[in-house]
Amino acid sequence: MKCVILAGGSGDSLWPLSRKNYPKQFMNIKEGRSLLQETVVRNMPFCDEFIIVTKESYRNIVNGQMKAFQSLKYRVVLEGSPKGTAAAIMLGSQFCNQSELVFVVTADNLIEGQEYKDAILRAKELAKQGSIVALGVKPAKKNSNFGYLLRDEENVLKFIEKIRLDDDESFGYDDGFLWNSGMFLYRAGDLINAARAICPELYDTCRMAKRKVAAIRRTVRFSQKIMKDIPQGSIERLIFEKLKDMKVVETAFRWKDVGNVCDLDENSSVSHSENVLKNHCEDVMVINSADRQLVVTNDIQDVVVVNTEDAVYVSSKERVDDIKNIISENKEKYENYFDYNRISYREWGIHELLNASDGYKVKKVTVFPGMSMNLHQHEMRSEHWSVVEGTATITLGTETKDYHKYESVFVPIGMKHKVANKTDKNVVIIEVGIGEILSESDMVKIYSQESDGTAEDNYVKAANEPVVKLDPAFKDNLWGGTKLRTVFGKKCDYDVIGESWELSAHPDGQ
């Protein structure tokens, strides 16, 4: 089964933890993993390939975070002009064979419970019979932020957009209403045929768009020009509301849509809870993501406080969602705070801003294994690099040399330079830039005659082939069981399976 992950959200709802350049689906939320990574981990037992649909500007973040999965088969579908879930799901599904099962999930949900497996297995049974299947969640409370569906047993009667529940007295939990989780399971051909019959415009424009793109490694880019004729809208509005005989599986697992900061746990990976002190507070939530700051609250109630290195958000819990309007109304003046955070992903690694003031800027630079910066130079600043982790292969002018931990190098203004990582571990450098102008635009890339100026130029060949390390891809901790065959679908003639080992040719495999 293939898994299409929708990961194109903009990040306003969780400000200041998430920003436009680093939205919530990429934040470390649980056990050091982001919501995107948690979504992948959750579905690895059921899916053999992942198709991640996201904005073009998030390409480097996705590829950077997917390096955590060294033997995983995945593809990134980039939307130059996002048009809603209908286009995203159609474009992603076109990369699957028509007979293959496709499981659509979103990258901003938290899910717990063994019942997740049961829901997927039941949905697969229905999908194999030709149905498009939604996963519905029994409402725990009235919530105007979610879409609903009305069902009769496993039959979907209608989809309902987000509604003002206080204004709709006819709504009742006993009437067969379920939250629409945004998760769907179907055979690729069944969805494509439904689109052709119900919304020919969506079918035709998505099919033409796919014909116009070229795959580079595992990345497919649909430019704004290619996507301009694709209709805007949700998959529910354009297809599912008009679909006959759609099925739904009511789920019993714990499901949480991370819609605002109140949906987070104060003790999650995003917060340093040891640096929070509450005194005489009632129903107060404090999330402190700044590891060098103490947050103290005193004699307040029904309030949420979110503290980061460069911004603080304080709101009543009732009005916490107002942040979207606040950002929209004040974006021009405070764009740097609303849109950007201190971490930025590149094709070759990560930049993290540590400190900045007039005349200097300090960054932590991480270069991924087997990656290299482009050769470049700066006209307005000099740089001082200190290697604090790994072995960096640094080019200065015409000279290339390896620098080890605790060794440093000075890069004068105008000097051509780059860093490459020819090892199988991250290289970490502390970079200090000095100059009157420290803009990211002060960079002149220098390509070789053989270069085509694409991200492919950022790959280097390792000096030594790394040792291949293998671990069980699937493991049944209860030795003597049949879980690997009955649950994960492993093909094996033995009655008892303890471990299953998989060999991968994935370029990041170890």
Describe the predicted segments one by one.
Residues 36, 92, 108, 149, ...:
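Residue-level signal for inorganic ion chemistry
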Residues 193-386, 393-395, 400-409, 438, ...:
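Left-handed beta-helix
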Residues 6, 105, 387, 432:
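Catalytic metal- and UDP-sugar-binding loop of GT-A-like glycosyltransferases, i.e.
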Residues 148, 155, 311-312, 372, ...:
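Structural motif
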